[in-house]
Regions:
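A short alpha->loop->secondary-structure connector
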Residues: 62-66
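Short coil turns linking two alpha-helices in DNA-binding domains
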Residues: 42, 67-70
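Polybasic low-complexity intrinsically disordered regions
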Residues: 17-27, 38, 48, 71-188, ...
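Charge-patterned, long linear interaction tracts outside catalytic cores
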Residues: 238-261
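Basic, short loop/linker segments at the boundary and entry of helix-turn-helix/winged-helix-like folds
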Residues: 1-38
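Short helix-capping/linker segments at secondary-structure and domain boundaries
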Residues: 39-45, 231-235, 256-261
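Helix-centered, glycine/charged polyanion-binding patches within enzymatic domains
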Residues: 169, 174-241
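DNA-recognition alpha helix
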Residues: 44-60
Length: 261
């Protein structure tokens, strides 16, 4: 976490707490909110744990842990744009080959945001998460989140356009079968391994021809299973935007784990 955070910020050599107990360097803030994901502890538990583990505090160049309210404030301050940059950087650290699969799964929401539910006029207990994952390294390059019903083809197009320059192959099941998405891939020199809906003999033949190369797509399911280990399927943030950020932080920690393995 610390090394990724230092590579991400503009001033990595700033002392961890340049202003004493009231201020912390940007790299420390990023590193600690990511480390809390790895710990899987509450805000108060994280503060207590760090104060008991002086060796870990020393890794972050700290004498004592920040107050638990600081963790909460930092997690709310770092927006999705910043977290996406961290996610892409962590994917590169884990090893990005350009051969990727796209897939979706649901994460259970422990606490529903009633305000958002009323605004959206939609009742939900799970958050649909779509990830772009390297089939060789299991590095997650991008993630898309929604609490509403959305067609996979449209989501796939958004994810592809954000990452087109880093993709050589894109694998997806028939839920993403859309001629526009295939053409978008080809126009960006990306090979689309997207299953057809088997409504005609020709579509069945197309699917049969790509089976050998397509079979690595199951690695996306492995990525989801790793994200959901140790009760990781449940989200604890109260707001929908907080849950988007929470899941993105989980993906970053997943990448760092893959890089270290």
């Amino acid at each position: 976490c610390r090394d990724l955070a230092k590579r991400h910020v503009d001033e990595p050599d700033v002392p961890a707490a340049p202003d004493g107990a009231d201020g912390y360097a940007e790299w420390v803030q990023i590193a600690l909110i990511l480390y809390r994901v790895e710990l899987e502890k509450s805000l108060r538990e994280t503060e207590d744990y760090l104060n008991e583990m002086r060796g870990i505090l020393a890794v972050f160049d700290l004498d004592e842990a920040p107050h638990y309210s600081s963790f909460c404030r930092w997690e709310n301050e770092y927006r999705m744009r910043e977290l996406r940059r961290l996610l892409r950087r962590s994917a590169e650290q884990a090893g990005w080959s350009g051969e990727a699969a796209i897939d979706a799964s649901g994460f259970q929401r422990d606490q529903t945001s009633y305000h958002y539910r009323d605004r959206a006029n939609y009742s939900f207990q799970s958050m649909k998460t779509t990830i772009l994952i390297d089939v060789n390294s299991l590095a997650i390059k991008d993630a898309h989140f929604t609490t509403q019903k959305a067609w996979d083809g449209h989501i796939g197009m958004q994810v592809f356009r954000r990452n087109a320059e880093d993709l050589r192959v894109l694998s997806a099941d028939a839920n993403y079968s859309w001629s526009d998405l295939r053409e978008e891939c080809r126009s960006n020199s990306t090979r689309p391994l997207i299953k057809h809906r088997e409504q005609t003999p020709l579509q069945k033949a197309h699917n049969a021809r790509m089976n050998e190369d397509y079979n690595q797509r199951w690695m996306s399911e492995t990525g989801f299973s790793q994200l959901k280990e140790d009760d990781g399927e449940k989200l604890r943030s109260r707001s929908w935007h907080g849950q988007f950020r929470e899941l993105t932080r989980k993906c970053i920690i997943h990448n760092l784990t893959q890089a270290a393995s």
